[in-house]
Amino acid sequence: MDRFLVKGAVGSLKRRMEQEQTGGGPAGLAEEEGNSKKNPRRAAPGNGVDSAGLTWGRIRAEGLNCDYTILFGKAEADEIFQELEKEVEYFTGALARVQVFGKWHSVPRKQATYGDTGLTYTFSGLTLSPKPWIPVLERVRDRVSLVTGQTFNFVLINRYKDGQDHIGEHRDDERELALGSPIASVSFGACRDFVFRHKDSRGKHPSRRLEVVRLQLAHGSLLMMNHPTNTHWYHSLPVRKKVLAPRVNLTFRKILPTTKRTTLLTASASVGSFALHS
């Protein structure tokens, strides 16, 4: 049986925020959130309120360590969403395609990267140089840093035009990531299901059967994926044909500059312990 953890763990905070705001959200958002037919089977354990007044849902399982909150009130989230739609420049051409088993396919979503000058990052076999930060991304990044105490120098942006766009099971375990650093996932637009599956529970004949953990990532929400989550758990955003509205997701990361990465690779290779991931 799947373990269904929805945003209800911080629902009371979200409702208070929305009562203070006026106006509607992105087209289709309220309908998608309000008319969901899925009921929570278990609330997120260990919830608490931090010094900034944010209510956090603590999501824990074997090797799974995540924290979830509503970071932006509705009006501010709407404003940021509209700015992202206007300002972000997404990949085109070859960068919008991916090679799988020798065949090239269009990526089922739009992608972009922004970050500090001089960084490179490998994603799905592509080595990317991020675009310079723009104000709307700095605004979100700085808010995340303020409430978490973490710093980030890179962001990967995924835009899902509707529920047909998706991303398959994967782990964010690229060698460029600073060892043990968290990934901050901020969502704007349509509420979408987000699924965690343990590495030992994948495939037709898994070695173990651990519960799948399902979340619903709301407009303006922050999901902190802390170490060692990406070591043990794959995550995905599955197809949801009934979702008609777009979603934009920002995943803030801390990646190593090329010089430090080369030093780490050389040192690790000398003891035969470095494994490459793409």
UniProtKB/Swiss-Prot annotation:
One of its GO terms (molecular function) is ferrous iron binding. One of its GO terms (biological process) is DNA alkylation repair. GO terms for cellular component: nucleolus; nucleoplasm. Keywords: Dioxygenase, DNA damage, DNA repair, Iron, Magnesium, Metal-binding, Nucleus, Oxidoreductase. It catalyses: a methylated nucleobase within DNA + 2-oxoglutarate + O2 = a nucleobase within DNA + formaldehyde + succinate + CO2; an N(1)-methyl-2'-deoxyadenosine in double-stranded DNA + 2-oxoglutarate + O2 = a 2'-deoxyadenosine in double-stranded DNA + formaldehyde + succinate + CO2 + H(+); an N(1)-methyl-2'-deoxyadenosine in single-stranded DNA + 2-oxoglutarate + O2 = a 2'-deoxyadenosine in single-stranded DNA + formaldehyde + succinate + CO2 + H(+); an N(3)-methyl-2'-deoxycytidine in double-stranded DNA + 2-oxoglutarate + O2 = a 2'-deoxycytidine in double-stranded DNA + formaldehyde + succinate + CO2 + H(+). Residues 1-49 are annotated as: Disordered. It is found in: Nucleus; Nucleus, Nucleolus; Nucleus, Nucleoplasm. 2-oxoglutarate binds at N158, Y160, H170, H235, R247, T251, R253. The keyword Amino-acid biosynthesis does not apply. Binds 1 Fe(2+) ion per subunit. The keyword DNA repair applies. A motif (PCNA-binding) lies at residues 3-7. Residues 151-256 form the Fe2OG dioxygenase domain. Substrate binds at F101, G102, K103, Y121, T122, F123, D173. InterPro entries: AlkB-like, AlkB-like_sf, ALKBH2, Oxoglu/Fe-dep_dioxygenase_dom. It comes from the Eukaryota. Fe cation binds at H170, D172, H235. Its cofactor is Fe(2+). Its EC number is 1.14.11.33. Activated by ascorbate and magnesium ions. The PCNA-binding motif (AlkB homolog 2 PCNA-interacting motif, APIM), mediates the colocalization of ALKBH2 with PCNA at the replication foci, coordinating the repair of alkylated DNA damage with DNA replication. Belongs to the alkB family. Dioxygenase that repairs alkylated nucleic acid bases by direct reversal oxidative dealkylation. Can process both double-stranded (ds) and single-stranded (ss) DNA substrates, with a strong preference for dsDNA. Uses molecular oxygen, 2-oxoglutarate and iron as cofactors to oxidize the alkyl groups that are subsequently released as aldehydes, regenerating the undamaged bases. Probes the base pair stability, locates a weakened base pair and flips the damaged base to accommodate the lesion in its active site for efficient catalysis. Interacts with PCNA homotrimer; this interaction is enhanced during the S-phase of the cell cycle. Interacts with nucleolar proteins NCL, UBTF and NPM1. Interacts with XRCC5-XRCC6 heterodimer. This is DNA oxidative demethylase ALKBH2. It comes from Bos taurus.
